[in-house]
A protein has these predicted regions:
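Catalytic histidine neighborhood in serine/cysteine hydrolases
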Residues: 181-185
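N-terminal beta1-alpha1 cap of cysteine-dependent amidohydrolase-like domains
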Residues: 1-94, 100-102, 108, 112-124, ...
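DNA-recognition element of transcription regulators
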Residues: 148
Length: 217
């Protein structure tokens, strides 16, 4: 395989787990928020982080915190570039929310059952249900424990997006696909999934994304 790069649209101090998985999949990671750099990459990861500026989905702030508007702008610009150029995108935690907002969707600024999903002394774990005809089903089967560290959640879905994984207790959307574009997103954190608690690994998801990147390169 020729040298291929996957961009990670975040800060170097917060993306070490992501770069490790990108390297494990045989790609060169490039942590950048510059669309000029992303133009030379074959894939994009939108990583976890704080909450998205509510104005970007048409709302005032009524529960969002740890907002970095400048970062949001750069991440959404990175996503838009990939969208227009059909470059595969993987969104993780905040990243899935960026995908949704970037396609016109909205966010619960504080999910009604956030106590089930938010970070306490560490990630919480809960079961999920996976849609049978989705890309996740061959990787993880019909049910899968996932790790949660979020208090927000997807609300109205953006154009072309489809939910493929849910928390059965409260219908929180845990993963997305797109009807025609190479866009995938998960609300959980595959880069730090505890194999002892989840009984599986996040590596399968990263390997799937790697195959998507190769297919579109």
């Amino acid at each position: 395989m020729p040298d291929m790069q996957i961009a990670i649209a975040g800060k170097k101090s917060e993306t070490k787990n992501y770069t490790a998985y990108v390297e494990k999949c045989g790609f060169t990671p490039l942590v950048t928020l510059n669309t000029g750099d992303i133009a030379h990459c074959q894939g994009l990861i939108l990583p976890g982080g704080g909450d998205i500026t509510p104005a970007f989905f048409g709302e005032k702030n009524h529960g969002s915190k740890n907002i970095d508007t400048e970062l949001d702008i750069l991440q959404l610009q990175s996503f838009d570039y990939c969208l227009r150029n059909r470059i595969p995108v993987l969104g993780i935690c905040k990243g899935i929310q960026l995908i949704n907002v970037g396609l016109g969707g909205s966010i619960y600024q504080h999910f009604p059952s956030a106590e089930r999903h938010c970070c306490l002394s560490g990630d919480q774990y809960h079961n999920t249900t996976i849609q049978k005809d989705s890309f996740l089903y061959p990787l993880y089967g019909s049910h899968m424990p996932v790790n949660s560290a979020h208090h927000q959640a997807l609300k109205e879905l953006g154009s072309g997006l489809k939910a493929i994984q849910w928390c059965p207790e409260d219908s929180c959307i845990e993963a997305l696909g797109h009807e025609s574009l190479p866009l995938i997103g998960v609300q959980w954190h595959p880069e730090r999934l505890d194999e002892n608690r989840a009984k599986t690994s996040g590596e399968a998801l990263f390997s799937y994304f790697a195959s998507l990147v190769q297919a579109y390169a």
